[in-house]
Amino acid sequence: MIYEKGYDTTIGEFGCIKHDQHTFIGASPDGINIDPKNIRYGRLLEIKNPCSDRKLNGIPKKIYWIQMQIQMEVWDLDECDFFETRFKEYSSEEEFNEDGTFTETKDGKMKGILIHFQGKEPIYKYAPIGLTKEEFDIWYDKQMEEKPGELNWIKNIYWYMDNYSCSLVVRNKPWFNSVVPLFQDVWNTILKERVTGYEHRKPKKKQKKTKVFK
């Protein structure tokens, strides 16, 4: 994983858990730093990969900031790294090979390969970061040998990391305490309408206007 390699840490993946007090609130972060020797130990991780070419300035959108605040409250942790990346795809294997080394572009950016398989849904296998050409060939052959029979190879995708940003977001308990009543009101409405129904929330059909020709 790029974040793990860049910050020499280990990220653990966890499922969704409920808030200790407000059990109607749950959160599942992209990961948590679990290396006790690392300065980021105990820090949450939120990853975004925007498709647009907007500048990565380290400032999360409001909805992402709220998401991270809820995650920190649920997990009772005080810090979260907001990690944004932008990847670009090479047009061909030849273009990939001509740009720098097997692991870096000419201007020092990280690059790599992933495999696109197709079954009922698309499946992507990501080669570990930093493999040599020889190590990649061994990994690649293993993926092809071990893939289930119902999966079809579609193509190899050659990529480089065009840009990235990592910024620290800290916990804001006063904000969370101020919005909990709003969350509670919404949850109370959900509980009520599970019983009474929510048909009234369906969009109303527009009545067709009858055209009158004179």
Regions found by a protein language model. Give the residues of each.
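Accessory terminal regions of nucleic-acid processing enzymes
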Residues: M1-K214
